Amino acid sequence: MGSYGLLESTLKEILEAIKPLREDRLTRDRVIADLRQVVQSLENFRGATVEPFGSFVSNLFTRWGDLDISIELPNGSHISSSAKRRKRSLLDLLFRVLRQRGGWNRLQFISRATVPILKFVSSPHGISCDVSIDNLEGQMKSKFLLWINEIDGRFREMVLLVKEWAKAHDINDPKNGTLNSYSLSLLVIFHFQTCQPAILPPLRYLYPGNLVDDLRGVRAVAERHIAEVCTTNIARFKSDRSRLPNRSSLSELFVSFIAKFCDINLKAYELGICPFTGQWEYLSSNTRWLLKNKALFIVDPFEQESNPARTVSLNNLTKISEAFVTTHRKLVSGNQTRNSLLGTLARPHILPFNTNGPVNYSRYNGLPNLTHRAGNSPQMQHHYRAGSSGSSQVQHHYQAGNSPQTQTHHEYLPVSSSQMQGQYGYPRRPTPQGQHQFQNSRQSPSFQLQMQSQHPGQGQRKWTPRP
């Protein structure tokens, strides 16, 4: 079996072990119901709703994934925007109530975080939970990632694999200065935008505005507007027959993903990763980015001045880069075995995992032995159907052994933008005035497909997003 064939089968084996089953979703539904019962019993939370978000809503969670929950406070039909002081007060109340009633372990109230969070583990189910107040932004971002699943089903598979790989290399832990899962999902989006041919467009073509800023007024109206714009543009993008299909296998996409970020520690000094524009952006092009710059800047496509990777420290950025380099070296080596690949791509407990056996959640959160039985139920099917299949196999532009410096990428760019310079779609240098690069180019509804010599005569195509 060739190196890519062995890698492909190993990745599929890992996916079978980490993909949630129907019972895993039902377990999280029960945790939400238990918390809802507690919240509704408290006078201070009268009229509040308990709503999940994060990977559970976007269908990007694994069998051991944490559960993000937002308690939405009543504000008539309008979007609630409680002050941070009130959020802290209510979470502190909930903290004391849960501790008193029992059934909730490892309670921790993080009051000084940007978003105050109450963390705990549901004792009956062994599920780790993060609870916040009025986190509608998180809910809408989660729904957007779910909608992206409609474009190409390989997106979900890549996110699950990348998250497991990152955990295996201890770089998926924001509390200790590495990447959070949302940042890892954005890296996968960015890779799908810059691979050749591109699988995803710049996200500004799916929603051209700042999504978080548009969450105001009547909640139902705001949510419906965002959903209509996104789903319309996604459908239009998928139906564009002039778009070159990308039929790369999962293994080819994974290897090129690892190669793309091997020198992320070097690029991060002056470049930010921007899924909104689908390209690397010079940090000097936006003074607000410079003011908020950390060791690594990943532009939140739904809140463009925010950096989801702000917790990454300089030392850990080197660690993250080394994980990419080490993994790339092993993936392109000629002496791969199943066991060596598993040791590189997954945590030790994944290796012998029986996908139809009991899921011991406490094994991963430090609780006493709490075993949850996941029977031989069919694999969970989400209420949104994933898009085009990612299992087809064709040749890929990336060849084993190529260094990141020699790899080229296929990018979608606005018509008014000039050709990108350098490797990995390096952007043009900013103007001396340091103008925001989003504003420098005309916001033409069309975008240009940059072609390479192996695709002669393809020329330019247009695709118009809904404003």
Label the predicted regions.
Residues S3-L11, F190-G375, Y426-R429, R461-P467:
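Pol beta-like nucleotidyltransferase catalytic core
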Residues M1-W64, L73-S89, F109, M140, ...:
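N-terminal regions immediately upstream of nucleotidyltransferase
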Residues M140-S181:
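Basic, alpha-helical interaction scaffolds
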Residues A33, S41-R46, L60-G65, K87, ...:
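Intrinsically disordered, low-complexity regulatory regions enriched in Ser/Pro/Gly/Thr
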Residues L35-V38, F53-S58, G102-R106, T114-I117, ...:
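Eukaryotic intrinsically disordered and solvent-exposed regulatory patches
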Residues L42, K87-Q139, E157, A168, ...:
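Conserved catalytic core of two-metal-ion nucleotidyltransferases
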Residues V39, E43, T49-V57, F61-W64, ...:
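Residues that form ligand- and interface-recognition hot spots within folded domains
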